[in-house]
Amino acid sequence: MSTSTLINKAQTNSCGDVGVVDLLKRKVYDDTVKTMQGLDRRAKYRLNQCLGPEQCRTVRGGYPEFQIEFTGASNTSHAMAAGLRGLELEYLYTLVPYGAVSYDIGGNFPAHMMKGRSYVHCCNPALDARDLARNENYRISIENYLSRFEDKSGDYCQWQRKKPKVSKPLPRYQKACFDRYNEDPEHVTCSETFEKCRISPPAERDDIYATSLHSLYDIPYQNLGPALARKRIKVLHAAFHFSEDLLLGASEGLLTQIGGTFQRNGDVLTFSFLDESSLIYTHSFRNVFEYVTRTFFVACNRYAYMKEFRSRRVDTVFCSFIRIDTYCLYRSVFKDCDEHVFAAMDDAWEFKKKRVMLEASRPIFNDVAQFNVYFPNAKDKVCLPIFAVKSVSGAPVTTRHILVEKDFYWTALNHILTYPDGKADFRGVMSFLESIRSRVVINGTTTASQWEVDKSQLKDIALSLLLIAKLEKLKISVIEKRIKIERQGLVSLLKEFLHGLLDEYTQTMAEWVVEKGWVKSVDQVLQVTIPDLVLNFRDHFRCEFRTSANVSEVNVSEHLVATNEYYAKVSDLVDRNPTLAFDFEKFQDYCEKLGVDIDTVTELIDAISTGRAGITLDHTDDKEEQLPRTLAGSSSYLEEEPSDDLVCLSDKAIVNRSTILGELKNNVVIFEGTLPKNSVFVSAPDDPSVTIELSELHARPVSDFLSMQKPVNIVYTGEVQICQMQNYLDYLSASLVACISNLKKYLQDQWLNPGEKFQKIGVWDNLNNKWIVVPQKKKYAWGLAADVDGNQKTVILNYDEHGMPILEKSYVRLVVSTDTYLFTVVSMLGYLRHLDQKKPTATITLVDGVPGCGKTQEILSRFDANSDLILVQGREACEMIRRRANDNVPGSATKENVRTFDSFVMNRKPGKFKTLWVDEGLMVHPGLINFCINISCVSSVYIFGDRKQIPFINRVMNFSIPDNLAKLYYDEIVSRDTTKRCPLDVTHFLNSVYEKRVMSYSNVQRSLECKMISGKAKINDYRSILAEGKLLTFTQEDKEYLLKAGFKDVNTVHEAQGETYRDVNLIRVTATPLTIVSAGSPHVTVALSRHTNRFVYYTVVPDVVMTTVQKTQCVSNFLLDMYAVAYTQKXQLQISPFYTHDIPFVETNKVGQISDLQYFYDSWLPGNSFVQNNHDQWSIISSDINLHSEAVRLDMNKRHIPRTKGEFLRPLLNTAVEPPRIPGLLENLLALIKRNFNAPDLAGQLDYDFLSRKVCDGFFGKLLPPDVEASELLRLPVDHMYSVQNFDDWLNKQEPGVVGQLANWDHIGMPAADQYRHMIKRTPKAKLDLSIQSEYPALQTIVYHSKHVNAVFGPIFSCLTERLLSVVDPLRFKFFTRTTPADLEFFFRDMVVGDMEILELDISKYDKSQNKFHFEVEMRIWEMLGIDKYIEKVWENGHRKTHLRDYTAGIKTVIEYQRKSGDVTTFIGNTIIIAACLCSILPMEKVFKAGFCGDDSIIYLPRNLLYPDIQSVSNNMWNFEAKLFKKLHGYFCGRYXLRNGRYLRLLPDPLKIITKLGCKAIKDWDHLEEFRISMFDMACEYKNCFGFDVLESAVKESFPKAEGCNVAFCAIYKFLSNKYLFRTLFSDV
């Protein structure tokens, strides 16, 4: 029953249940998708010959294993056969194991070299002149290929001689082949026949194969077996042509599919093509006949080769000759020689004497080769004899055979047998046959004949059928009757019976029938034999058996060993230089070109980096850089050797206050004192007397805390350790100030709905005794409260029996956060402020140990419970040490001698200690360690840590800790170089990280694995596996995602430092590049060294961890030597200045086809064009799906959507453009979850008010021209902002529908600014990467206000935007709004001169990443421009907590502080934020040019400027998942900024244009024309082809595999400029 019948039947039974029908249709679609996915995984083959559509279908049907691309780039004779020859070769080598020694008999060795098959030897004997020409063509093809890699300039190619210059290296996979051919061409190709080939296979190899592509005819069949055995060939895979007509006695056999023909003249068999008379190949028919009919080919007295048929494809027969060991035959097949002779004697009457003797000498394999197996054209046909006689009477009758359909034969014969004896003549039979093969007319309708019979053979068939019918009648008449023939001979009897059949030929025919043995007399009995109608081919093969042998098994151990040793040398080089960017292929080619090994080059790089080679890479004399470099230098107290390249101050040097202030040019505070040698330290408080005690915390005004705010850059002087202690106090102050400032902002916000949740805070309504915002935890230690007068004070909290806070009645509201859960910061700051800041007198020893070296075990073994103290950072580590210590000595570890740092400072207890032991001390601020040393009064301190693991991390973003003060001071350092935890492969990695030799006691050799997952949702598929190990993540965002997904016991890598686990599963579900996941990052070192047995890395994107794991998997099982880490510095090319002129115009040629566009797209984004996404939405709707969502209210009545199929034009260009989707509950919810609910949380602790104002000042200070300084000049007059003229100007720009909606507005009250509507764009954004192949893209969400809200705020922000654009420096900065692409090109026109650095900051989830800090920054900028306070407050209330309603999908939810994609400040607000972000990071006052557009940006900077890590600051301060690109060609607003000599052009991205040409949302032809016009308006610059070469280089900079660029650029202009040609890109469905 068909699928459509099932669907219709199910629809009838379900009374029109659409769901059941959709499920059945879904089943059909799923099966289709699985089939298409399987087909897409096939090997790809490009066939260049020009073939017709029917030929293309034939080739595809004959080779379904390949995904064939027909380019039609070559128009040659016998194109079908020529194109198939390469395809047949690739098919043969799919049967040969990769890397196995192989002989290609008569093979095309250039084809093997291009494919990188260095394990193939080709035998190319010159048996005739055509072979000589073919071999010469092989060598010419190699020269043509090598010329592609040579310089094409005329300087190297001259008439007199050619001086080739290689401009690029060969591909890596071909290098081994060309090396082999260069060293010894005889090993690649020889001029001997295969039987006499002198190239022997390696003695140790037994995986030896051979192939024969149309070359088997020239090897005598009796020599094939011995020749294969001499080379120890295991299997010979062969392909050859043959026609079954030749076996039937025909002199000609046609191969219609390839246009070939066989001609036979005796034993001479010639092959040629119908359309090519010059190509004629001559063979021996007997030799070819033996290859076709034989089954076994004897090699020696033991081995033979059995022919096994594989398939027949497009007139080509494929078979395999498999070596068999006759000694392995079962013993029951043995017979004596006499038995062989006797068994064959019975067949002597049918076969010749020679055949009998040959049968007796062969093995007793009675195998049968069926005729219709080898030749499928003979299936269901019979072999009919055709008789012919000469015109001269008495001449003999000749016979040949043809194939006719069996049904036709029996139908005709049975009908002829019904004729009476007197009426069975040739004319009647001929008339009948003509009638049954002709077309007939039945009821006015022409009906084709059931059988196809050649008209030219019809008369011969009639004659044969008449003769066979006569014989059948004769047999029937004499059956079971004895006939006496004494008086009449057999011939005369037949002559009488056949009288009238052939008239004068009756005598001759009767004699011929008797001679053939069809009619004979045996014992006076007439026997009539009808010839067999189906031919059978048998080849009996017999020999003697004397010994036996066992079948050898396949050995795979060598493959495993080779895998371990692969790339060992290259891995060693990269491990020693993890910070260098190596292109392995280019680096290897460079080393081989110089003739040096990789070890020598590595030593040279190391010597240059360390200075041992006497070469200095870095020279700078810029005075502006000297002070920052000095401040960034390391102290002699912290380094084992002094740094010679720093600016040094003499010991006890006098500080010149004015000089330092002049250098810094910022808010810098200097304290008198002395500077230690080789050190300058930064930071000190303004007023050391301002302190906050814990006892004074209650009812303390907020102003007391805010007065503790410190300048950003503060200089400390004095002893190193004292400066560290002062810096730690300022760090605590900054943390407390940031906390209070944020609580103040939350306290001033308006909260309407009780019981909601917001970020990590809680808001208590003291008047109504309930939580307005429910906190995550209970019983916070303190908070910030506001009284009835609006005064804000800190309060210490108490709670009732129900866990509710108890406050005085004078307070109306309270706010708490995760930072107020404990008194940690307040208590520590209050106590440490009163301590004397003196240099510790204890001896400090740093025990620097590698991961797993037993640092904690050493502490416990040396710890004296009566006199020592152990301090650790976290509570979990503290409990672990107490447990382990008490397991050894019960009661030794107590809460008095094993404590955390916070507990030791806050809960001070009397007593002194002798020795202080600190575990993982390098994760603690050095100032806190110095304080604890003084408090504990110890005489010796042992700090255990690892300088290569994660150090102390500053969590307060508006406070800086100089690198000098972040390093620990110590008197002595002791190393621990042997790990007890890490397996051997991890130890190998550690040797690339540490400068010392690392060894391991572990007996686990290999433990590292990595797995790529297609998306973060796929991590749920590994839930059962992940339950068996510790779960770690790099970021808190990934940790929160796993916890929301239901995973338990998840920690970050930072939290797990110092811990040990048996199995570790490290998970990364964030695709954005992370600073902590990079080469040399301590987070990577910690992540890879936490386990003892097994480590598995699950990641959605390849990164340095995955690369490290893969490299480690390739090394051998022993530890490698250790080397130092080397650094290098890249040099920049200098560009000479030149003059600018108008851009020349060169009209673009209108060339190129649709196939050129498709080829360009496929080379850029391979695989995207094969994505079948027409039914993806219905797959999502009809499948089970698990979603992790925030709080949301759903109307389940909206879950069903009508499946209406829109009528759209079908694009002929296949791109990854999604078809339009129908909005619905699931679709809209999925978009909401993947976009609005998937906002990153990367930022650290920020003081929103302080930092927003600082960023605002920097924004205007850097973007405004020098003549605009006073803030009063920025402010817009209020009268103009709220004027009627301003509103009219805004209203005139709106659509008529908007005006109609506003006409019904009553203008009573302010519309609700926090109420938004939610919808989705029906057409997803086109993907310009490969994610479409494995990910269902979510639709873009639109969150928009009503038109009433826009009418209030639209004119205001429009006026403010105009003011902002008018004050920004127009010569250096461009906000791409209210401008044209021509204006943008004019702005960047002078960027062709100068040595500059081009920076692009690409941010994912830009709108959704914006939080309270971004909103504060934007509002500060609007304040500077003059926005009204009331309007600002209303706008803030509408964005802090947004209520979304999706009426189409039935969704209601609330989101916090995200950029709304549909309000009046969406575009300009995004543009302001990206500009402010870059102004806070980069020295924008020094830029040449900068452009901003939404989330897009481009900056032209001078080279060698100092600026912080942009990606890190974007993550930690701005909460952006950012990627920084430094390229030769800029990219801005979807256009490439191309610098071509003296000119600069902005050309649209060709990939975006070609992708849009595959649009699946075109309704009709009129819509298509509108679409073309809009596309041509965008890409009209393509009419000028000047600069296309630069555009190609810019494209290949991002996508190196892009091919066919110039033709594609011309094709874009060709189709877009002609509406008739553009219509050919689409078809009407």
Swiss-Prot record:
GO BP: any one term: DNA-templated transcription
Highest taxon, organism lineage: Viruses
EC number per UniProt: 2.1.1.-, 2.7.7.-, 2.7.7.48, 3.6.4.13
Gene3D superfamilies documented for this protein: 3.30.450.420, P-loop containing nucleotide triphosphate hydrolases
InterPro entries: (+)RNA_virus_helicase_core_dom, Alphavirus-like_MT_dom, DNA/RNA_pol_sf, P-loop_NTPase, RNA-dep_RNA_pol_alsuvir, RNA-dir_pol_PSvirus
Annotated Pfam families: RdRP_2, Viral_helicase1, Vmethyltransf
Family to which the UniProt record says this protein belongs: Belongs to the ssRNA positive-strand viruses RNA-directed RNA polymerase family.
GO molecular function: ATP binding; ATP hydrolysis activity; mRNA methyltransferase activity; RNA binding; RNA helicase activity; RNA-directed RNA polymerase activity
Every (+)RNA virus helicase C-terminal domain range: 977-1130
Keyword annotations from UniProtKB, A to Z: ATP-binding, Helicase, Host-virus interaction, Hydrolase, Inhibition of host innate immune response by virus, Nucleotide-binding, Nucleotidyltransferase, RNA suppression of termination, RNA-directed RNA polymerase, Suppressor of RNA silencing, Transferase, Viral immunoevasion, Viral RNA replication
The protein's name: Replicase large subunit
